[in-house]
Each structure stands twice: as structure tokens, then as C-alpha cells.
């Protein structure tokens, strides 16, 4: 009951946030202790308590300095923890923005390989494998890893008090859709469906109703029912690739002959294009044939 009441309260706040914007950088104070910030179409979150602030994905050096300036000018505690949601450099390249050696930087274990050679990335001080609970100043944040999905080490972040998820990629708050990058260099077909199944299990167990993504959109939050809808999309891609192989409509370069495919099931999804569908099916057939 407590979680349900907080969810209603949170949704009311999400539609009336206090906003601050400058130089392409903007901040939405969703509540007293939850802040959403964005820069150039990417967004992330800042969790503030009486003792310190916890930053998820500082994005880049400019954004990190803007966040530090916001905290200072609003008499809010400085950052004690930084959480990397995954290893992609466009979300974590802070440069020299953080000089405080006491900041704990947390990442999933598989991220280490991708972070070791980039001097613009503040190196993690703590790695975890499957689950980590962070409790600071009475705030609890749970980190979950469900295997490779969007890259090798993307995690799910659960804000326990708000009962809200931060899902950095693979989902959109408006609903299931084609991905923004159809070349899918990051996609891991071998474990993607299991990732969604595990995420659905978490949502059901914790009775989580809403999520925020790592990309700006018309809606700040989305319903967690979208998780199952997006899983169905990827299952469709997988079964299409498998059936196309059986039907012999995939050529030697792993391109599908769309003229021999009923396109209606795919056209219902937002951001559909035939070129993107070809690329996605090619990604799956490449995996089926070569394991890559």
C-alpha cells in the first residue's frame, strides 16, 4: 500500500516538475530528492539525500560540471557516489570534472575491459557482478545485472523509495518500437530475451509501475508494461530470422528478401522502416550463422 501511494505521489510530481535549463543542459527537480537532467537528447538521474548525492551516468565533462554547479548553488550535498549504467563512453566521459578522490565510482564487472584505456573516463573504484545494494543517508538503490543486452554490462537501477526504475536503453516511454540505431552494434541476441524476462520478473516481484530511460522523450516516465511489449518485438525479430533461414529467403550476405515477407506485423511498431528491418534481421541471422 505504501508503494502504491508513493507511486501516485510520484506521478503527480512528474507532471509538474521544477525545471532549470541553460546552454543545452536542463534539470527537472522531480521531487526533493530525485532530479532528472539531460543534455543533447540524453538524460540521467541524480539522487539527493541529507548527507550526499548519488549520480548516475554523468554523460560528459560539461554536464558533470553543470551538475556540480547546480548542487553548489542550491546548497545541496556534493556527489559521494557515481554509478555507471554501462560502458558506453557517451554517458560516462567526465574528464577532469570530478577531482574528489573520495567519490566512489561503481560499475558492473564486465565494464572494466571497455573502460581501462579511456583516460576521459573516471575509473571505477568498485565493481559488482549480479546485484549490489547501495544505502546512503537513508536512501536505498538496488543495482541489477541480467547479462549482456545493450552491450556487455548494462545494469538496471531501482530507486527503492520511489519504486521507480532507471533503464538506460532498449526501452522508450511511449511504447514498444524499432530501435533508434538499426545497425545494432551493441545488441546481444544470445541473451537479450532473457534480459527482458528477468526484468519482467523484477517488476512483478517489486510491483514496480514506472520507469525512466536514458533518452529524452515526450513522456518522462513510461509504464513497466512496455517491457513485455518490447520483449515481444525482439522475439518477433528472432523468429522472423529463424523462419527466413528455413524458407531460404536470406542470401549469402545475410540480407532478407522483404518482397517474400508479410510486413504488417512489423509496420505496427513506431519508427518502422524497411531498411531498418533488413538490418535487424541481418544482425540476427549473422548471430545464428556465426555466433557473432
Go through each PLM region and give its residues.
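Bacterial N-terminal signal peptides
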Residues: 7-17
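Metallo-beta-lactamase
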Residues: 22-24, 28-30, 52-53, 60, 109-153, 160-161, ...
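Divalent metal-coordination and catalytic microenvironments
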Residues: 33, 47, 57, 71, ...
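Active-site metal-binding motif and surrounding structural segment of the metallo-beta-lactamase
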Residues: 51, 62-106
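Accessory terminal helices/loops
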Residues: 203-209, 217-292
